Regions:
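Generic detector of contiguous secondary-structure segments
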Residues: 13-19, 98, 115-117
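A generic secondary-structure micro-motif detector
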Residues: 40-41, 96, 119
Length: 169
């Protein structure tokens, strides 16, 4: 993604994260996931990430509103395909459609990169996430333990149409 995408629904703009956003992204993630700490009995993995490394090594896009970072999505390609590694929405923006918009952005990025599916995972006790992902077309395909985390893996087929390799004469 290049540049800024102004005029998004909800009055925010999307742009690539930069190194100078590290502290703001870390603070956003801490705020977005804080309510899960008691529920799952530990810090969710996104709260333990080093965001200077994440911003350097992955595609991180932030959503800004009035100059403040209120959302972020972390994307990467893995052996399984195009991964939405993290979606974080500031508590003040929950219920505004920002999370869904970040997921739609991620899906568009996957299509642009030539992928016909996108996958993600979430803790099994993050039931709001599971419900949202199911509502918008994600289907559970696996459950795995990763350390102390019981994770639900979900995938969404994007219905990409691949260009034909034949040419007309």
């Amino acid at each position: 993604m290049t540049g800024t995408a102004p005029h998004q629904p909800g009055g925010y703009s999307l742009r690539p994260a930069t190194r100078s956003d590290t502290a703001s992204v870390a603070a956003l993630v801490a705020a977005a996931y804080a309510h899960y700490v008691e529920r799952i009995g530990m810090l969710p993995r996104p709260m333990t990430d080093d965001y200077s490394t994440v911003i350097r090594d992955r595609q991180v896009t932030v959503a800004e509103h009035d100059g403040a970072i209120v959302g972020a999505v972390v994307l990467t390609v893995t052996d399984e395909g195009f991964l939405i590694d993290n979606v974080a929405v500031h508590p003040s923006r929950r219920g505004t459609g920002l999370g869904r918009a970040l997921l739609q952005f991620a899906e568009a990025e996957a299509r642009r990169a030539g992928f016909d599916a996108v996958h993600l995972y979430t803790h099994e006790r993050m039931t709001e996430n599971l419900a949202l992902y199911s509502r918008i077309g994600y289907v559970e395909y696996d459950r795995r333990w990763q350390g102390a985390f019981s994770l639900v893996y979900m995938r969404k087929q994007l219905g990409c149409v691949r260009p034909s390799s034949s040419t007309s004469n």
